Amino acid sequence: MIQRPPLPDGMAPAAAAVPALETERLVLRAHTRADWEDYRPVLMSDRAEYMDGKLDHTGAWACFASELASWLLDDIGYWTAARKTDNKAVAFVGIMQPSVYPETELGWLTTEEGEGQGYAHEAANAALDWAFGPRGLTTLVSYIDPRNARSITLAERLGATRDDDADRPEEDDLVYRHPRRAA
């Protein structure tokens, strides 16, 4: 029998494949079933307006599960960004390349409670450091709906610049290219 190290409550053994990252206020960790209760309202509400619109329960679950499955398939995926003080999910940040994406993308979602607190910026910075450091990626973009002013502002705060020549999954998407960080 294979011995596995103990995992935090609510995490399945496959979650051990997801690297945990820490920032000043957050822990970026694998999604757990408990996080679904914070994730679902984001994708099933108007908060998903710039991500192809709000989804039904099945569509939201498919997104949640694919973000975790991506770790097993590609060694990249989404993290739940949880506050250190209470382990409450306040954002979901990750690196993925679904089959329809021409390049690997850094993306983010915030819960209503997490909006405007700087959590997505903090978590995305940690994800960028990991992507260009230990993970060894050489390029990373964010695909953003041109109406999503908050995400455009966040991408620019992260140092990304528009790349109008890049391929994109949706014709209207803006592509923001993140500068490579020192490993």
Task: Label every PLM stretch briefly.
Residues 72:
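Extracellular/periplasmic catalytic domains that process cell-envelope and extracellular macromolecules
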Residues 57-58:
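Conserved phosphate/ATP/ADP-binding segment of small-molecule kinases
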Residues 1-50, 61-69, 78-183:
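Acyl-donor (CoA/ACP) binding surface of acyl/acetyltransferases
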Residues 75:
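Beta-strand acidic-aromatic groove motif in beta-rich domains, primarily in extracellular
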